[in-house]
């Protein structure tokens, strides 16, 4: 008989290398020992997102590695998932991966800005925002961001907006900054 589930740290240490070789990183591990059967959820992301095929491949690899642990219970549910659209964007890497996506950003002065994520540096993000009837780029220091969440869109964005974000054809970013 086994003694229980591995810790979050053990799961990250065990699976981190395998996920990294596949081009993904583990963002979080949630272990629910109270669920029946117990559940281990691994949240992973990569520069190009995590599609269903990659999640299935990672899940098979993770299951094989976890099954080798002598501390794990006989029956458990393993889930490998992407962070989802409701995950707050916190790091430059999160913003880079969200390039081209529409976000709501709460700033340290309690103002809110809605825009499309453009180029992200180590200390700033460029948001494509409405400027009257046109589009403009607003540079925001990451230190001023209190909260940022990707918004679900039900209609396609304007081509000019995508181009300014650097994801829709010609890159007019430098032209609009002048």
From Swiss-Prot:
Q: Name one GO biological process term.
A: ribosomal small subunit assembly
The source organism is: Mycolicibacterium paratuberculosis (strain ATCC BAA-968 / K-10) (Mycobacterium paratuberculosis)
Q: Which GO terms describe its cellular component?
A: cytosol
- Report the main location listed first in the record: cytoplasm
Q: Which InterPro entries match?
A: Ribosome_maturation_RimP, RimP_C, RimP_C_sf, RimP_N, RimP_N_sf
Q: Which NCBIfam families match?
A: PRK00092.2-2 (NF000930)
> What cystine linkages occur within this chain?
none
Give the highest taxon in the source lineage: Bacteria
The protein, known as:
Ribosome maturation factor RimP
């Amino acid at each position: 008989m086994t003694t229980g589930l591995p810790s979050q740290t053990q799961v990250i240490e065990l699976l981190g290398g395998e996920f990294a070789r596949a081009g993904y990183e583990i963002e979080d591990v949630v272990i629910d020992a109270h669920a029946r059967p117990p559940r281990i959820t691994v949240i992973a992301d990569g520069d190009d997102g995590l599609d269903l095929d990659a999640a299935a491949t990672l899940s098979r690899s993770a299951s094989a590695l976890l099954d080798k642990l002598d501390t794990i219970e006989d029956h458990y549910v393993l889930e490998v998932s992407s962070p989802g659209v409701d995950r707050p964007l916190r790091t430059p890497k999160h913003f880079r991966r969200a390039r081209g996506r529409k976000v709501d950003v709460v700033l340290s002065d309690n103002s809110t800005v809605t825009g499309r994520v453009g180029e992200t540096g180590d200390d700033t993000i460029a948001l494509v925002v409405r400027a009257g009837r046109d589009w403009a780029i607003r540079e925001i220091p990451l230190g001023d961001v209190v909260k940022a969440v990707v918004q679900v869109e039900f209609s396609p964005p304007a081509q000019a907006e995508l181009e300014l974000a650097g994801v829709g054809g010609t890159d007019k970013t430098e032209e609009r900054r002048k």
